[in-house]
Structure formats: C-alpha cells, structure tokens
Amino acid sequence: MKKLTLAELATITGGELFGDESLVVGRVAPMDKAQEGDVTFLSNPKYAKHLSECKATVVMVKAEHKDQCAGNALVVADPYVAFARVVQAMDTTPKPAEDIAPSAVIASDVKMGENVAIGANAVIETGVELGDNVVIGAGCFIGKNAKLGNNTKLWANVTIYHEVSLGDDCLVQSGTVIGSDGFGYANDRGEWIKIPQLGSVRIGNRVEIGACTTIDRGALEDTIIEDNVILDNQLQIAHNVQIGYGTVMPGGTIVAGSTKIGKYCQIGGASVLNGHITIADGVAITGMGMVMRSIEEKGLYSSGIPLQTNREWRKTATRVHRIDEMNKRLKAVEKQLEQKEES
C-alpha cells in the first residue's frame, strides 16, 4: 500500500485531525488488529469501548468518539466513507495491462485514444472505439463496433460482444461476458426455432461489474445498465432488462427478460426476479427474494423461509402443504357458526 501522512489523510477525507500530522501510515487494518503504522476506523458504535485499547497510529471516528481514542484521531462525517476514500488513495493494485502487448491482435481500423493499454493475446476486432486511458487485460475479446469509454478497465478474459457500448470509468472483472445472445426461441409444433438477438447492451458511466457475470443482448432493443450501477459476481441479466441509476445487486441474482428495475434499488444476493415486471425506484429486496410480480412502491421486501433446524423446517414445510386443507376446514367452521347465529 502507498504510504501517507496523517495530514494527507485529513485532506483526502475532509476530516479534522487531532494529533501529529507528520506521522506516516502504510496500511489500513481492522481496529482489533491495527498496529503502529496503521490507519483504522470506527463505523459501528458498539465497538467504541475498544478505542482506548487500539494501537493504530490514527483512528477515523465521528466527533462523539474523539475523546475515547488512545492516540491520534481523525474526525470525519462518516468513518466508513472515509475508509473507502483512504483505501482508494493507498491502493497499489497492478493494472490489467501496462502497455500494448506484441501478441495482442488489433484490427487496423480500431480507434484508440491516448494511453491505451492492451494485454497479451487480447483480440480487438474491426470498428472498435477505445477512449483515453482504457485498459484491456490479457485474453480479452472486444467484438466488432464495440465502444469503451474513457478510463474504462477490463480485467483478464472479459468478453465484449459486437456493438456493445460501455461508458466512462467502468470496471469489469475477469470472466464476465457482455452481449451474448438472449434466451429467445419460438416453438413450432414441438420444434424450437432460435430467434436471433438483434439488439445490444448499453452500459452507462461508472458502472462496476463483478467476475463471471453475464449480461445478454436485447432481442430487438438494447439491454440497458444506467450510470453508477454496481453488479456483483455471477449475476445473470437477461435480454432487454433495464437497470436504473445507482442500483446495486449482490452475487447470484437472476433477472429474467424485459424486467425494468428502478433507480437506487438494492437487490439482495441470490434473488430471482421474474420477467416482464417493473420494480419501483428505491426498492430494497432481502437476500434470496423471489419476485414474481411488479413492485410499485418504495420499501423493503422479503420472501422465503429463514434458516431453521432441519426438524423445525420439516414441520414448517408440512404445515405449508396443509394450508389449503386447513383453509377449507376453517371455511366450513365459519359456515357452521354463521348458520348457528342465524338460527
């Protein structure tokens, strides 16, 4: 990690330092493991009681916890946000590529901006446009007429199909495939006929996509991922899906075709969203949610049975299977009571 002075940390975070600004830190560490030379943070107040024992060179805290610190304190509005900014500043992760490798295969008409880097054995097909500071890792494939905006970075073995576009400042992790065919077939008396997928995928600015995620191209119109969306690992985004500004989706989630997800949504991991539905802005769905119909109002939604012991779960499952029978018996009892009241 890059070394920084406490004065530099204060500038990066916009915080107020109480202590020696000349001291240097070279690592970010959890509060219970931090040592001299480390910077740490307190985001959960329940751990404030441990501040007096913390050995870090500096702790990033809210103002109400400053006096509990054993040493230097950096007072910030949000310690977790400050932590994120400090890690960004200290990050020394290598780039996917540093220059244009001799083994890269690049079509003669590819338009490249300044400071483009392309790793070994990457293939860049005809008509591709690469913005300034684009970095393409080893073994990537960029199909015909695809476009990558300024500062966009692809790690090794990413596949970008033909005519797909990514905006500025995007990050795509290894193994992800963008623009493969959507799942479109017509059935002619038992024979499946493939429907060519003629749309594409349009991805906005500052979008991050995790490893081994798949985003299908649209059937006729485009699949759309708006600005500031974050998609985790191993997601399946089907054809013609639209994902609104600032939405986040953890790993394992599946979104069926033509579903529209609003702005600032949070979709819990391993959730499944049915096709041709609409999710309103600001909806949060807890993990393993099964969304079968549209959600029209902002709020928190859940489905599924929380973890139980196997014995408890078997009892619950048995009761669930008996609900229809119990409902019939309840209606019969209600009818008998109504008859008694009438008599």
From Swiss-Prot:
First-tier enzyme category under EC: transferase
Family annotation (Gene3D superfamilies): 1.20.5.170, Hexapeptide repeat proteins, MurE/MurF, N-terminal domain
Keywords annotated in UniProt: Acyltransferase, Lipid A biosynthesis, Lipid biosynthesis, Lipid metabolism, Repeat, Transferase
GO biological process entries: lipid A biosynthetic process
EC numbers: 2.3.1.191
Chemical reaction(s) catalysed: a UDP-3-O-[(3R)-3-hydroxyacyl]-alpha-D-glucosamine + a (3R)-hydroxyacyl-[ACP] = a UDP-2-N,3-O-bis[(3R)-3-hydroxyacyl]-alpha-D-glucosamine + holo-[ACP] + H(+)
A Pfam family reported for this protein in Swiss-Prot or TrEMBL: Hexapep
Cysteine pairs bridged by disulfides in the record: none
MF terms in GO: N-acyltransferase activity
GO CC annotation terms, alphabetical: membrane
SUPFAM superfamilies documented for this protein: Trimeric LpxA-like enzymes
Active site (UniProt): H239
Entry-linked InterPro entries: Hexapep, LpxD, Trimer_LpxA-like_sf, UDP_GlcNAc_AcTrfase_non-rep
Pathway note: Bacterial outer membrane biogenesis; LPS lipid A biosynthesis
Protein family membership: Belongs to the transferase hexapeptide repeat family. LpxD subfamily.
Task performed by this protein: Catalyzes the N-acylation of UDP-3-O-acylglucosamine using 3-hydroxyacyl-ACP as the acyl donor. Is involved in the biosynthesis of lipid A, a phosphorylated glycolipid that anchors the lipopolysaccharide to the outer membrane of the cell.
PANTHER family listed in its UniProt record: UDP-3-O-ACYLGLUCOSAMINE N-ACYLTRANSFERASE, UDP-3-O-ACYLGLUCOSAMINE N-ACYLTRANSFERASE 1, MITOCHONDRIAL-RELATED
NCBIfam families tied to this protein: lipid_A_lpxD, PRK00892.1
Oligomer status and interactors: Homotrimer.
Name of the protein in its database record: UDP-3-O-acylglucosamine N-acyltransferase
Source organism (scientific name): Vibrio parahaemolyticus serotype O3:K6 (strain RIMD 2210633)
Gene: lpxD
